Amino acid sequence: MLWTRRACGGAWLLRAARGPEPGRSASGARGQGWLQPTGYDTGVKVYNSLTRRKDPLIVSRADAASWYSCGPTVYDHAHLGHACSYVRFDIIRRILSRVFGCTVVMVMGITDVDDKIIRRANEMSVSPASLARLYEEDFKQDMAALKVLPPTAYLRVTEHVPQIVAFIERLIANGHAYCTAKGNVYFDLQSRGDRYGKLVGVAPGPVGEPVDSDKRHTSDFALWKAAKPQEPFWGSPWGDGRPGWHIECSTIASLVFGSQLDIHSGGVDLAFPHHENEIAQCEAFHQCPQWGNYFLHSGHLHVKGGGEKMSKSLKNYVTIKDFLRSTSPDVFRLFCLRSSYRSAIDYSEGALLEARSLLRATAAFVEDARAYLRGQLAGGPIQEDVLWERLGRTKAAVQAALADDFDTVRAVDAVMDLVHHGNRQLKAASEEPRGPRSPAVLGAVVASVEHFFETVGVSLAERQCVPGAGSPAALYSLVEELVRFRLKVRQFALASGEAPGEARRQRLLERQPLLEACDALRRDLAVHGISIKDRSGSSTWELLDPRTEDPKPRS
């Protein structure tokens, strides 16, 4: 059994309980009213679940925007539904920092004690603590594989039980919670009056508690659960037990950020009751009119034609590990980018193939443009003024889209339109290979396309060709020399000179084995993820993603 001595809340508890910090101005809003913060205006208008409209995103500090993210309950492998939510918020975080100059301090809570964890641990005949550690590490590995940036800090519930106890004590002292004879502690929703329901506008009602519970009102929710046989427990003034679900996030967020939080995020299914109850707890604890300024919610990942949420309870899920065996994280990220983070998204092979096709087209354009810049792709003049103008319009369109509730759909469309026009210019240039070349504008277009995808976490340039290989630069040079040597052999085999008809035919026949060897080398390299393209008078090469055979241009 677990036993942790109760400690006082310490300085953080006094600081957090002082109430609202200065620097908020009143603003008209629906229902309970929303207080528009003052501070650093990011330049973004974001859909705020508190107001159900797009509000200016104003954070307390540009160099330390506070963001709390609900983390996983670690009892099993994470699935694509989880991946979709975390990837979408990772994209937003990257955009905030890399486009709008806002340094994000993100904290993620890890629920490592819970009914599901206890039940699964009993099924596997292991301790809840060891099970939770196993799947916590599994979750972190999945996030790294998806290229989701880690939060500034992960905080486990089990390592903050004393602070949770102190938080509950203050709620009781403030008249917002009560202890029962059975040793349970509940939040008294009646004490909030009409201030409950800020987020989703629902009236208090019974949520997930047994009918025969010892609550005063059916709508009250558990802050502390009395210990049961064969379950982990901690000591408290009300007897042995463990924390309820909602109080965990409220305590952890307050521990780090105090009485004011800039951004709170999670899946749309967490809006009620979880986030609604967090708001009630924190505003009762801090005695403030507004604790969290912006609540962002991501839509579900749906299967079966959009009618069913992907979830473990419905047994219709695909684990992240299984998915990544056949699909690259870049394809999945582009799949997520092609819908609003707030909307439900249908999981289908068709949608993934479309994302893969777009990534392939972008990678091919970048490689062709680089070949043109290196002089390996024959080409003539490009309509520079047209391409420069399109590049400027694209940059402005991307900036405007991202400032409008992180509209990645419009941003991706704008970039793909630029790629389309760049391809058209390259094709026209290759059809008329005479005249002056125009590499500068194509270089600027490639840099802009790569910058956008790097900003949102999609890799177009894979610097390491083969896993476990030595220096990527050395390998690059080796392949470059090999392709150059092959090109010379191929050009020699195809050259007929001034020989007459029969002599020319005989010469080509004699050199046929050289062409066959060149083709064999191309096939052999393709097996190892290197694709060679023979062009008129030149040959270029590119890397292939071994899971998808999509080209990945070299940096």
Swiss-Prot record:
- What compartments host this protein? Mitochondrion
Chemical reaction(s) catalysed: tRNA(Cys) + L-cysteine + ATP = L-cysteinyl-tRNA(Cys) + AMP + diphosphate; 2 L-cysteine = S-sulfanyl-L-cysteine + L-alanine; S-sulfanyl-L-cysteine + L-cysteine = S-disulfanyl-L-cysteine + L-alanine; S-sulfanyl-L-cysteine + tRNA(Cys) + ATP = (S)-sulfanyl-L-cysteinyl-tRNA(Cys) + AMP + diphosphate
Q: Which CDD domains match?
A: CysRS_core
Residues bound to L-cysteine? 71, 111, 274
> What keywords appear on the UniProt entry?
Aminoacyl-tRNA synthetase, ATP-binding, Ligase, Metal-binding, Mitochondrion, Nucleotide-binding, Protein biosynthesis, Transit peptide, Zinc
- Recite the UniProt cofactor note for this protein: Binds 1 zinc ion per subunit.
Q: Which cofactor does it need?
A: Zn(2+)
What's its EC? 6.1.1.16
Indicate which residues form the motif 'KMSKS' region: 309-313
Q: Which GO terms describe its cellular component?
A: cytoplasm; mitochondrion
PANTHER family, from UniProt? CYSTEINE--TRNA LIGASE, MITOCHONDRIAL-RELATED, CYSTEINYL-TRNA SYNTHETASE
What role is this protein assigned? Mitochondrial cysteine-specific aminoacyl-tRNA synthetase that catalyzes the ATP-dependent ligation of cysteine to tRNA(Cys).
NCBIfam families in UniProt: cysS (TIGR00435)
What is the protein's name according to its record? Cysteine--tRNA ligase, mitochondrial
Organism of provenance? Bos taurus (Bovine)
What is this organism's lineage? Eukaryota, Metazoa, Chordata, Craniata, Vertebrata
